[in-house]
Amino acid sequence: MKHIILCIHFLLMVVGLGQAQDCSVAPNMRVNCGYPTVTEADCRAVGCCFDSSILNTKWCFYNATAGPIKKLECSGDPTKRIDCGFPRITEKQCILRGCCFDSSISGVKWCYARTVITTPAPDTTTASTTAETTTVPTTPETTTVPTTPETTTVPTTPETTTVPTTPETTTVPTTPETTTVPTTPETTTVPTTPETTTVPTTPETTTVPTTPETTTVPTTPETTTVPTTPETTTASTTAETTTVPTTPETTTEPTTTPTTDTTPPTLPPTPETTTETTTETTTETTTETTTETTTETTTAPPPECAADRVDCGYSGITQADCEGKGCIFDSTIPETKWCFYTEAEAPARKAECTVDPSVRTDCGYPGITDKECREKGCCYDECIPDVIWCFEKAVPVVNS
C-alpha cells in the first residue's frame, strides 16, 4: 500500500508541474485572452495566464495548450468574417461577448465570430494513452514480491486516476461550440443605438416655445380698451389681440395693419376674414425668426459638409460629454463623425494631428483605447496598421 500511495503522489506532482509550466509561453507566441487595461483578477477568472513582467507584450494570454486552438479560431479569410458587434464597438466589449477582435486590417469587420475548431479532440486521446503507458511500469516489477503479483492491484489505480483527469481538462475546446455567438449579432441589430441617441429635436423645443408666449401675454389690456364694439363681433377683438404684439417683434412695416382694422369697424364679416389671414402670417413669421436664430448658434453643418468634420471625441462618446468639451454633436448622418469641432476651431485641430505616420512620437502604451488617448491630450488614428496610433500633437509653426 505504501508503494501505491507513493505512486499516486508522484503522479500528482507530475500533473501539477505540467499545469504550472502550462503558462510558460514565449512572449512572441502568446495569444491574447483579454482586452486593454484588463486586471489580473479578471484575466485569471476566465482561466487565462497573466504576466506583466515583460513590456510591449500581451499580459493576459491563453496557456500553451489552448493558445494554438484560440489562434486558429480567430484566423481565416478577413473577407469572410461574420459580424459579432455593432458600429464603434470597443475591443473590451467585443471580447466580453466571446468574439474575436482585430483592427489591423481596414475595410473589414473588426469584431467577428469565432471559427469552431474540431481537430484537437484526437490529440487529447493520444496524450492520455501515453500517460497510461508511462505510469504503469514504475512499481509492479520493482516492488512486488512473488506472493502478491497475481492480484495486480497496482495497474488499476493509475488507470482510474490518470484517465479521467487529463482528457477532461484538455477537451475544453468543445466549449467554443456553445459560445459561437452568431445569434447575438442578430438580436443586437445596431440601427437601434443611433435612433435612441438622435436628439436633434431638443434644441428646437427648448428655444421656440418660450419667447413667443411671453410676448403675446400683454395683448389682454388692449381688449379692455375697446369695450364699445365687442357686441358687434367677437372675432374683431381677437384680430386686435393677435395683430398688435406681432408687429413690434418682427418688423415695423405691419404698422399699417391697425389702421385698416380701425377704419371698417361697422362691417362685421370683413374682420373675420382678415383675422384668419393675419394670425396665420404672424405665426409663420414668428416661427421663422426663432428658428433662424437658433440654427445660427447650435445646429450642425449640412450633410454635404459632413466629410470635413474634425473628430473631437472618441468611440461611444455621449452627447453630454461631447457638448461638455465645447464641441458639436450630430448623430443624424451615419458613417460620419458625430462629435466634432466647430468650423472656426477645426482647421487648427486638424493641423495638430496631421503628422507623418513614420515620425509619430508615442503618447500611450500597448492596448490604449481611443478614449484614454484623447483624455491625455494626444492624437489617435487607427486607420494605418503597423504604426503608432496614439501620438503627440504637432507643434504649430507661427509665422513671424
Swiss-Prot record:
It holds the Pfam family Trefoil. Residues 127-261 are annotated as: 15 X 9 AA approximate tandem repeats of [AV]-[SP]-T-T-[AP]-E-T-T-T. Residues 122-302 are annotated as: Disordered. This is Integumentary mucin A.1. Coiled coil: none annotated. The keyword Glycosyltransferase does not apply. Extensively O-glycosylated. Consist of about 70% carbohydrate and 30% protein.
